[in-house]
A protein has these predicted regions:
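Conserved phosphate-donor/acceptor-positioning beta-strand/loop module used by diverse small-molecule
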Residues: 142-162, 168-176
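Glycine-rich phosphate-binding P-loop
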Residues: 38-55
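Extreme N-terminal, non-catalytic leader segments
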Residues: 1-34
Length: 230
């Protein structure tokens, strides 16, 4: 656990430096701030690989669910991240969270409150890919482009068996258990359905598309929505 915290602390330290560097750049050299790409995926669908490919191609910061959760659960690391934005922008995040709680009948506990603040802070910096943790339900529409990565169950079971070198029966159990946990987390935390396609800007089926072409499709749709060429 201590080793994991050190890894997250190192990641956050480097990330803060990068954010600070972006703000110090001259306007003509500054990177254009683009919306955060949020990636929700069915277990075994390759959503993490798609997210990593998107981040690599766009030169975006990459936040996987373990990093986001680690930041949200550590008071010291969390405050470092939240302090990276100006008070005026933090106030805007807090106002949006209040409206999110009110409009969606969410009753956040301590962890969810912290998660909302952390994801909201990443959203204000932009130019990032966030995997999981219901990020698409947290960020306002103008700050994120949300995708859902799916695949047929049998393919997902085969993927998990291959990746983790376990029998297919064990892989099936793992897929079903993780899927159930993710559905429950989103339902309990955001009063929403993780499987409803209306909650996403784009749904990708990796049973029909390779990782690279999936990433290309996401980037193409993102840029088209912004009126930019890829």
């Amino acid at each position: 656990m201590a080793e994991k915290k050190k890894t997250i602390e190192k990641f956050v330290k480097e990330q803060i430096k990068k954010w600070e560097g972006m703000y110090l750049k001259k306007p003509e050299k500054a990177q254009t701030r683009l919306p955060v790409v949020t990636v929700s995926s069915e277990p075994g669908s390759g959503g993490t690989a798609v997210a990593q490919e998107i981040a690599k191609r766009l030169d975006f910061d990459y936040f996987h669910r373990g990093i986001v959760e680690g930041i949200a659960t550590s008071a010291e690391i969390r405050s470092t991240v939240i302090d990276s934005i100006e008070k005026e922008r933090l106030s805007g995040i807090e106002d949006f969270i209040a409206s999110l709680v009110r409009d969606n009948y969410i009753y956040p506990g301590i962890y969810l409150e912290h998660l909302l603040l952390v994801v909201g802070t990443i959203g204000k910096h932009g130019n990032a890919v966030i995997v999981g943790r219901g990020a698409n339900f947290i960020l306002p529409p103008d700050e994120r482009f949300s995708i859902r990565v799916i695949a047929p169950l049998e393919l997902r079971v085969q993927n998990v068996a291959k990746w983790h070198k376990v029998p297919e029966e064990k892989a099936r159990q793992r897929v079903i258990q993780r899927e159930s946990k993710r559905r429950a987390f989103v339902r309990q935390s955001f009063n929403a359905s993780i499987t409803d396609p209306h909650n996403y800007d784009l749904v990708i089926n990796t049973g029909r598309m390779k990782i690279e072409s999936s990433a290309e499709s996401v980037i193409g749709a993102l840029m088209a929505g912004l009126g930019k060429d890829t």
